[in-house]
């Protein structure tokens, strides 16, 4: 599996549109509570927001979208809510995967799905197989996922593959075993719902990601909210350890070369 460029080892290519957007979809419960509805109603409406975000990402030329659907810590929630979330996850898989495939979307799940009901695991595997050849958008769902778990499982795989690596290993040795090893590191991280933390999501991959926090509750997140996040991203100066002067000089050199090419 070819590794994508590391932001701590080199300078990834960047553009006005983020190639990879990662989202923590927070605020479903509060959205429901404000409307005197059960929490599951917020999660159900949240699925609609996911569908709209996928469409908006495709229209804007985003190539990778990763959402945090269920963390390894979410098992601590009330048992009844977890049960309803699992039912909603299964229903969404049954209803959405065919549409994703018809729209050229590659679907996959990262995380320890062995903890889920076998029926969910079966639908996940079927969906991944069905959409494996698609490339219009790479849509990844993190389920029973945690950033620390991801790093630990990568280290275990690395040592199993090469026991000597336990003593002599480098960043790429771990990186190639991470859950998103074949995807570019996220350019833009979005968290809805007003909280300002990353909650054990993609700890390795977010090293140089631009972070964007919004008070918008996830069920209310739409194309215009995505555009606001991208507009904020465009204003950022992505230095990757460099100074502003270095970036300005690099841009000046690019402009000079471009002008010379026109002559």
UniProtKB/Swiss-Prot annotation:
Bias type Polar residues, positions: 243-263
Binding site for substrate: 27-31, 39, 43, 71-73, 75, 77, 191, 197-199
Keywords assigned by UniProt, alphabetized: Magnesium, Metal-binding, Transferase
GO BP, sorted A to Z: polyprenol biosynthetic process
Record region (Disordered): 241-263
Cofactor stoichiometry and binding remark: Binds 2 magnesium ions per subunit.
Protein name, entry field: Isoprenyl transferase
Organism annotation: Nitrosomonas europaea (strain ATCC 19718 / CIP 103999 / KCTC 2705 / NBRC 14298)
The encoding gene: uppS
């Amino acid at each position: 599996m070819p590794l994508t460029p590391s932001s701590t080892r080199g300078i990834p290519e960047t553009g006005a549109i983020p190639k990879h957007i990662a989202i923590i979809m927070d605020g479903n419960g509060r959205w429901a509570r404000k409307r005197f509805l059960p929490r599951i109603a917020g999660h159900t409406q949240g699925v609609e927001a996911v569908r709209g975000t996928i469409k908006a990402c495709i229209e804007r030329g985003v190539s990778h979208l990763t959402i945090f659907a269920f963390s390894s810590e979410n098992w601590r929630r009330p048992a009844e809510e977890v049960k309803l979330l699992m039912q909603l996850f299964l229903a969404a898989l049954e209803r959405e995967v065919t549409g994703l495939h018809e729209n050229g979307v590659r679907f996959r799940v990262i995380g320890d799905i062995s903890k889920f009901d076998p029926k969910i695991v079966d639908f996940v595997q079927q969906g991944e197989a069905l959409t494996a050849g698609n490339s219009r958008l790479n849509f990844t769902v993190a389920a029973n996922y945690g950033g620390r778990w991801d790093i630990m499982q990568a280290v275990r795989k690395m040592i199993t593959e090469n026991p000597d690596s336990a003593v002599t290993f480098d960043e790429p040795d771990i990186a190639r075993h991470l859950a998103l090893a074949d995807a570019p590191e996220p350019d833009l991280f979005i968290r809805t719902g007003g909280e300002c933390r990353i909650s054990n999501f993609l700890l390795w991959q977010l090293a140089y990601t631009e972070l964007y926090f919004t008070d918008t509750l996830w069920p209310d997140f739409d194309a215009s909210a995505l555009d606001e996040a991208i507009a904020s991203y465009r204003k950022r100066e992505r230095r990757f350890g460099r100074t502003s002067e270095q970036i300005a000089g690099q841009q000046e050199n690019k402009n000079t070369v471009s002008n010379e090419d026109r002559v």
